[in-house]
Structures are given as structure tokens and as C-alpha cells.
Design a protein with these regions (language model features):
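Pyridoxal 5′-phosphate
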Residues: 1-404
Length: 404
């Protein structure tokens, strides 16, 4: 296990105060704080290396290109992808999903074809499919959950038909913390000859991800939820699928040749990377991945699982508490309500105590409907959080509850 105080020292923002109280940052599912090494790496590139990548013969351009492509290799190693050509840089999980949805539907889906998603999906894995449903007449089928937040796998198997073209599911629910059985989801889909896309925005920061072990066909995640910068994300796709998909956007960098008669597209991964990439952000992402790798993903997972279990246990000492997502196989998220206190009131008053949590539907309105609530308070944990911060949260919730 790593030294938690030394880790916290790596994150300058954690030492600040809010309303004259120490900051207790428990909104990590929305975004994580950044270690100094990431901030320094990005600043150094802008100061000393800044030049457009892939397009210059001069020294700075070649140096920036080397950093950018080294970042791609770092990502490949981090998720154990077979080839760097299967790593596509995007602006985040949302764009990664939209890329697959748009290109896959254009090539493989028509009226009456079906996609399977789950009721716990983030809107970024619902709305793009609905846009295609309106355009092409495809249909969404939905995997239900039980009251603890587990997918009903027997019902999942029943959703397949000869019109099912793809399955697209979250690895970890951003609202419930449920860790979904992705390997089983993939195995069942492949038995039906159907590919699977996995939204890994809430799994990649918390435990080791091996896309070859999962055997998923596409995997998406963001930089900002794993201690890297905003505006950068990753799409992994199996080469045999990426080769078959048309480009998502057109522009510079993704072409081999252009005339007014035709365009020949670049090889992978550049076919899907139109325009100037955020090459400083990719360097920042690689630095973040190296940082968590040095701490050890197994160590991070153990620490966060311990925090989650402790928080769930302590929350049950609060009169009137309602916990959402109570499956034992959950990670780094505790969502709750207390009595009739509105989630916005709870979040606002906790903020006055220096405690940052997220309130609302968390871009997951369908699962809110399933739970029968308009919104919840969500505390979400990271590698730098402590049991003392959990104690502060529980104490704060009790204090707020006494006001009502």
C-alpha cells in the first residue's frame, strides 16, 4: 500500500480551504484532481517543445510528435491493447462513444436493427443511440437491474434477436458504483456474433483494466477522470472492427491523398484523428497513467474498496438514510438521500462545511426513474481520499439532517 499523506502532497489543490474549512473533495466521478507531475509535464511541453505534430521536419515538431506517439504507447500498455494502431485519441469518453455509434450505425445498422444498453447508462451512452434511432429507425433494448443495482443477466440474454447488432454498456455505474460483469456480457454477446463497446470512464481510474482479458471490441475512457487533463480521451477498438468503420470526421491528418474526385484515408489510427490533436493533453494523460501505474492499480483498488466499504458502513448510522447501489461488488461511489431532504439542499449545506459532493441525476436519468427518485447525493472517491474525510462527510450529513 502507498503512503496516503505522500500521495496527497502530490495534489496541491487538496491543501486549500473552502469557507475557511479544509477541502474534502468527494466529487471524483465528475473529475479528479491533478498531481503536480501532470501540471509540470504540460507546462514544460508548452514552454519548451510546443509545435504541431506529424506535420513538420523541424526539431520541435519531431520532438512533440515523439511525445504524442509515446503517449499512445503508454495508453496501449496501460489497458494491455495488442497494438498502438488500435488506440485512438479523442476529446473524451463522450466523443469516443459518439465515434463508434456514428460510424458503426453508418456501416452496419438500418431500420429495425437493435442495440442493447443497460438502464444504468450515462446519457453519453444513450443519447447518441437515440439520435441514430431518429435518423435510421434503430431500436434500443435495455438491460434491467434489481433493487441492489445489479444487472439482471438472465433478462440480458433474452434481449438478443437476429436484429441485434451491438451491445454498449458501462463497466462501472457512475451513479451506483456497480461493477458490471463485463466479461460475461462480452461472452454472451459474442456467442450471438455481436460486438461489445464498454464505457470505461468509471472503471479505468479505479482498478486494472485489460481489454484483451475483457475481450471487448471497443473500450472508451477519459483523461480527466484518471488524474489527467480535460479534453482528451481514448477509444480502443479491435483492428478488425476499426478497419471496417468509416471515418467519423474529415479534415487534415486523416488522409493519405485528396483530389476533387476522391480521398484516400490514412491507416489506423490516424483515419479517426482529423485535425490537430491536443498533443499537450495526450502528454499529460500519459504522465497521469505513469503516475497511477507507479502507485500500483491493485494498491489503488484496495484502498478505494476499503474507503467505499467504510463509507457504506458509517452511512448506515445516519437516521433516515437511503443508500442506492448496495451490491457488494461496487467501487468508489456512495449515493444517498436522507429523509425528505432535497439532494440540492444537502449538497449545498455540505459545501458550506467544505465538503464537495455531486447532486442531481448525474447524467443518468433513466436509472433515477428506476430508483423512483429525481436525484441523489453522490460521494465518489479517489486514490487520495482518506477515512478521516469519510468521517467528515458522515458528520456533515448528520449535522445537515439536524437542521430539517
Amino acid at each position: 500500500m502507498y503512503n496516503i499523506q505522500k500521495v496527497r502532497d502530490d495534489f496541491p489543490i487538496l491543501s486549500r480551504t473552502v469557507y475557511d474549512r479544509p477541502l474534502v473533495y468527494l466529487d471524483n466521478a465528475a473529475t479528479t484532481q491533478k498531481p503536480l507531475c501532470v501540471l509540470d509535464a504540460m507546462r514544460d511541453e508548452y514552454l519548451n517543445v510546443n509545435a504541431n505534430v506529424h506535420r513538420g521536419v523541424h526539431y520541435l515538431s519531431q520532438q512533440a510528435t515523439d511525445l504524442h506517439e509515446a503517449a499512445r504507447e503508454t495508453v496501449r500498455r496501460f489497458i494491455n491493447a495488442p497494438k498502438t494502431e488500435e488506440i485512438i485519441f479523442t476529446r473524451g469518453t463522450t466523443e469516443s462513444i459518439n465515434l463508434v455509434v456514428s460510424s458503426f450505425c453508418e456501416e452496419f445498422m438500418g431500420e429495425g436493427d437493435e442495440v442493447i444498453v443497460s438502464v444504468m447508462e450515462h446519457h453519453s451512452n444513450i443519447v447518441p443511440w437515440q439520435l441514430q434511432a431518429a435518423k435510421r429507425g434503430i431500436a434500443l433494448k435495455v438491460i434491467p437491474i434489481d433493487d441492489s443495482g445489479n444487472l439482471l443477466m438472465d433478462e440480458y440474454e433474452k434481449l438478443f434477436s437476429d436484429r441485434t447488432k451491438i451491445v454498449s454498456v458501462a463497466h462501472v455505474s457512475n451513479t451506483l458504483g456497480t461493477v458490471n460483469p463485463v466479461k460475461d456480457i462480452v461472452r454472451i454477446a459474442h456467442e450471438h456474433g455481436v460486438p461489445v463497446m464498454v464505457d470505461g470512464a468509471q472503471s479505468t481510474p479505479h482498478f486494472k483494466v485489460d481489454v484483451q482479458d475483457l475481450d471487448c471490441d471497443f473500450f472508451a475512457f477519459s483523461g480527466h477522470t484518471i488524474y489527467g487533463p480535460t479534453g482528451v480521451g481514448v477509444l480502443y477498438g479491435k483492428e478488425e472492427w476499426l478497419d471496417r468503420l468509416p471515418p467519423y470526421q474529415g479534415g487534415g491528418e486523416m488522409i493519405e491523398s485528396v483530389s476533387f474526385e476522391r480521398t484516400v484515408f490514412e491507416r489506423l489510427p490516424f483515419k479517426f484523428e482529423a485535425g490537430t490533436p491536443d498533443y499537450v493533453a495526450t502528454h499529460g494523460l500519459a504522465t497521469a497513467l505513469n503516475y497511477v501505474s507507479a502507485l500500483g492499480m491493485d494498491n489503488i483498488a484496495a484502498h478505494e474498496r476499503e474507503l467505499t466499504a467504510y463509507c457504506m458502513e458509517q452511512m448506515q448510522t445516519i437516521p433516515g438514510i437511503r443508500l442506492f447501489g448496495t451490491t457488494p461488488d461496487k467501487d468508489a461511489v456512495v449515493s444517498f438521500l436522507v429523509g425528505d431532504i432535497h439532494h440540492l439542499d444537502m449538497g449545498t449545506l455540505l459545501d458550506r462545511l467544505g465538503i464537495a459532493v455531486r447532486t442531481g441525476h448525474h447524467c443518468a436519468q433513466p436509472v433515477m426513474d428506476r430508483l423512483g427518485v429525481q436525484g441523489v447525493v453522490r460521494a465518489s472517491f479517489a486514490l487520495y481520499n482518506t477515512k478521516e474525510e469519510i468521517d467528515a462527510l458522515v458528520s456533515g450529513v448528520k449535522r445537515v439532517a439536524m437542521m430539517f
